[in-house]
Amino acid sequence: MPRLGRFAINAKNYFLTYPRCPLTKEDVLEQLLALSTPVNKKFIRVCRELHEDGEPHLHVLLQFEGKLQTKNERFFDLVSPTRSTHYHPNIQAAKSASDVKSYMDKDGDVLDHGSFQVDGRSARGGKQSANDAYAEALNSGSKLQALNILREKAPKDYILQFHNLNCNLSRIFADDVPPYVSPYSLSAFDKVPSYISSWASENVRDSCAPERPISIVIEGDSRTGKTMWARALGPHNYLCGHLDLNSKIYSNDAWYNVIDDVDPHYLKHFKEFMGAQRDWQSNVKYGKPTHIKGGIPTIFLCNPGPKSSYKEYLDEPDNTALKLWASKNAEFYTLKEPLFSSVDQGATQGCQEASNSTLSN
């Protein structure tokens, strides 16, 4: 057995406390980095803390690539750069680097060097609670912070379920999409056929809207102004390429929907959208079903062709009944020329057709 009072520590993680130490965090880090050790230093965190008496204390977490054995209790002593004063720390082997790091996070005045080495243990007893780790991640305020917390405190889930975590956290911490502002007024579209203008004036309204409005399908070549015109009518939901109806994407306060370049063969909720149906639900990926208030018309925009045209889709032999239903719930028009006379709108239209905004003004 070792003699009483003999100093010896053999550990990968060291927790040092320097009481009444006025050195800056930068001075401490510089001196610790200069220490010659047989194993590489992987991570150093220096934390400055003011106690109630106003005296500064310094805490240090040192992580090594492998175990560092030392029998020299003066090994981690620091020296003042301006005088011959030495500062001796209390030295402990950190049972849980994650707990020590979290403790130092509370004070906030920290300086880090290197990459923190994840420790799945907790000094509070065994493995940390998964619920605690996930609760902290949800309260972190950002996707990146949440992922970093789970990397440290739920490393198994981080490795095995990263694809799900990444996707779910992207949705949870999705930024609010700013309202769309049309670069053109409706008057800029000076070649809109009268029957399309009439449809818009009768069906796209905030007040006095029809109880069961009629939708419209507009088919035409690219760069004819379909999308720009449709998005200039008022506040709307813009769905392009695929449908995502979660509450951060789809608004029940919109006047109408614009469904742009969605293959009708794979259009989810075809009848609900085209028929302006009210009070229906949609299953949201990685979330609970969302309630759609509905009762608003939809503008369907498409190009000619078998995987785009709604007319060609409804002409398929298996869709006879659906075609009859659609003829009573939507108007179908084919554009022969652009909806504008200015060349500039055509260039902008090409960019717009590639975008995917949401509720827009």
Swiss-Prot record:
GO terms for molecular function: ATP binding; DNA binding; endodeoxyribonuclease activity, producing 5'-phosphomonoesters; helicase activity; metal ion binding; nucleotidyltransferase activity; structural molecule activity. A divalent metal cation binds at E49, H57, H59, D107. Its cofactor is Mg(2+); Mn(2+). Its EC number is 2.7.7.-, 3.1.21.-. Residues 8-116 form the CRESS-DNA virus Rep endonuclease domain. Residues 156-176 are annotated as: Oligomerization. A motif (RCR-3) lies at residues 103-106. ATP binds at G220, D221, S222, R223, T224, G225, K226, T227. Residues 143-153 are annotated as: Binding to RBR1. Essential for the replication of viral ssDNA. The closed circular ssDNA genome is first converted to a superhelical dsDNA. Rep binds a specific region at the genome origin of replication. It introduces an endonucleolytic nick within the conserved sequence 5'-TAATATTAC-3' in the intergenic region of the genome present in all geminiviruses, thereby initiating the rolling circle replication (RCR). Following cleavage, binds covalently to the 5'-phosphate of DNA as a tyrosyl ester. The cleavage gives rise to a free 3'-OH that serves as a primer for the cellular DNA polymerase. Homooligomer. Interacts with the replication enhancer protein (REn). Interacts with host retinoblastoma-related protein 1 (RBR1), and may thereby induce the transcription of host replicative enzymes even if the cell is not dividing anymore. Interacts with host PCNA. Interacts with host SCE1 protein. Binds to host RAD54 protein to ensure geminiviral replication. There are 3 rolling circle replication (RCR) motifs. RCR-2 is probably involved in metal coordination. RCR-3 is required for phosphodiester bond cleavage for initiation of RCR. This is Replication-associated protein.
